[in-house]
């Protein structure tokens, strides 16, 4: 059992040296939580048109000071912000309506809100409130200052210790068990979406691609920014109305081939993550492992085709370094079985839990969250040092421009009060066109505002 005490160093220090000196008698002191696996909480019935929100007080944009960009994804950006009144630090996910409508992902945004609003547990990031303006949608969520697993992996120079890997993977399995028991398939599981809270526990985030209880769903679905057109691997012809959801590295072959998929998609992604943690890079890349860890461009269709070809031609033969234990290799190979019907986890989570890789795991204490990844130590509530900045976030001028534009847009527009106030909407569009010269307010975004009158975003409106 890999148990860590609260003396774990900050990212500013060397993780590798610390873990090499851990003694077997280390213990932790963390609060005990009721196991949601053994005792399932009551939840509201789910529906596509659910209108309840998780906060009785709707929080308008003007209530927050936006501090910096935490991350950027296919749907939008996540900002670190502070409530002006309560001084509470939160993470605010901002989504452009124009992108959502163009990509026909309105239902997916509503599904994400439904999941975050109705499932309150220790394994999912908490949603405080949600609202919309004429151009954007906002999720006000808890800020998890322990960072994400992508940052954690990079802090180890892409060589995470096996004991720590086992600890994290076990916590992810408990999270997936909770989701699958409630009929939720995440569909975008990757290190960036696996967060660490202030108590050192794993929480899953970003449910923008999630679905409820689907089996063999049609592949005639739309796409996010960093997802790519489905193609026939035999003739490389694209099919315009067939799209793939997800991030290229983590997509299973049945999705690429349009064969339909179910909960085993999450187990495939877990196998990719396990490989990445232990070896330092995903198993299917456009370059050889020694040449490049990350793709030259996530949006380079040629590179994505190479990745997809490798995934669909996968025959259980992967590169493994000699240092890797056979039991870890066996787990990876079974999670990455190209046949989803025999893939580990196809018959339920117990298949995964019973694998010899987890022979020393006491699942009960993981369900009760008695095991930490590590104990974050932060200087203040706004400390983001556990998040390693991505390249696109390093430009401070760009970050300031983004935040200034977000606030400027809010101040310049007279936010409409209801969907029937058409004249006010048109006036707001004119004000925005005259006052905002930022790339955020491009022609597509301005031209699509009138369509919002006919789009049912399940968000409180201002």
Swiss-Prot record:
Positions of the UniProt region annotated as Disordered: 414-447
Entry annotated with the keyword Nucleotide-binding: yes
Positions of ATP binding: 70-78, 93
GO biological process: intracellular signal transduction
Catalyzed reactions: L-seryl-[protein] + ATP = O-phospho-L-seryl-[protein] + ADP + H(+); L-threonyl-[protein] + ATP = O-phospho-L-threonyl-[protein] + ADP + H(+)
Catalytic residues as annotated in Swiss-Prot or TrEMBL: 188
Segments forming domain AGC-kinase C-terminal: 359-462
Keyword terms: ATP-binding, Kinase, Nucleotide-binding, Serine/threonine-protein kinase, Transferase
Keyword Transferase: yes
Family matches, as PANTHER family: SERINE/THREONINE-PROTEIN KINASE (PTHR24356), SERINE_THREONINE-PROTEIN KINASE GREATWALL (PTHR24356:SF1)
Membership in a protein family: Belongs to the protein kinase superfamily. AGC Ser/Thr protein kinase family.
Full protein name: Probable serine/threonine-protein kinase DDB_G0286841
């Amino acid at each position: 059992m890999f148990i860590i005490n609260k003396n774990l160093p900050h990212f500013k220090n060397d993780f590798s040296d610390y873990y090499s000196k851990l003694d077997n008698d280390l213990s932790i002191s963390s609060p005990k939580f009721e196991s949601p696996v053994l005792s399932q909480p009551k939840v509201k019935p789910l529906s596509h048109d659910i209108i309840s929100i998780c906060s009785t007080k709707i929080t308008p944009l003007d209530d927050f000071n936006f501090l910096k960009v935490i991350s950027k994804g296919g749907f939008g950006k996540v900002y670190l912000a502070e409530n002006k009144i309560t001084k509470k630090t939160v993470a605010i996910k901002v989504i452009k309506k124009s992108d959502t409508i163009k990509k026909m992902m309105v239902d997916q945004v509503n599904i994400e809100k439904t999941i975050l609003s109705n499932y309150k547990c220790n394994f999912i990031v908490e949603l405080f409130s949600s609202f919309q303006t004429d151009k954007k949608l906002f999720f006000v969520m808890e800020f998890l200052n322990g960072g994400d697993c992508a940052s954690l992996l990079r802090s180890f120079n892409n060589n995470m210790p096996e004991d720590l890997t086992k600890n994290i993977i076990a916590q992810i399995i408990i999270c997936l068990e909770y989701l699958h028991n409630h009929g939720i398939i995440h569909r975008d599981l990757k290190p960036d979406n696996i967060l660490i809270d202030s108590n050192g526990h794993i929480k899953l985030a970003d449910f923008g691609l999630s679905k409820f209880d689907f089996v063999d769903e049609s592949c005639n679905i739309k796409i996010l920014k960093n997802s790519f057109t489905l193609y026939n691997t035999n003739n490389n012809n694209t099919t315009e109305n067939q799209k793939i959801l997800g991030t290229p590295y983590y997509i299973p072959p049945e999705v690429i081939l349009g064969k339909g998929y179910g909960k085993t998609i999450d187990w495939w992604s877990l196998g990719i993550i396990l490989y990445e943690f232990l070896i330092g890079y995903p198993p299917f890349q456009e370059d050889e492992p020694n040449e490049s860890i990350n793709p030259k461009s996530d949006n380079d269709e040629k590179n994505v085709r190479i990745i997809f070809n490798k995934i669909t031609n996968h025959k259980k033969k992967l590169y493994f370094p000699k240092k890797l234990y056979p039991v870890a290799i066996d787990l990876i190979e079974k999670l990455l079985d190209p046949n989803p019907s025999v893939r580990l986890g196809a018959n339920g989570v117990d298949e995964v839990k019973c694998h010899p890789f987890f022979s020393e795991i006491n699942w009960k204490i993981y369900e009760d969250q008695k095991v930490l990844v590590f104990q974050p130590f932060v200087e203040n509530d706004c400390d983001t040092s556990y998040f390693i900045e991505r390249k696109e976030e390093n430009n401070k001028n760009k970050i300031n421009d983004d935040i200034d534009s977000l606030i400027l847009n809010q101040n310049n527009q007279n936010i409409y009060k209801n969907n029937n106030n058409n004249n006010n909407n048109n006036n707001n569009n004119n004000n925005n066109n005259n006052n905002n010269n930022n790339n955020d307010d491009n022609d597509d975004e301005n031209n699509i505002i009138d369509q919002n009158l006919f789009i049912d975003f399940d968000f409180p409106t201002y």
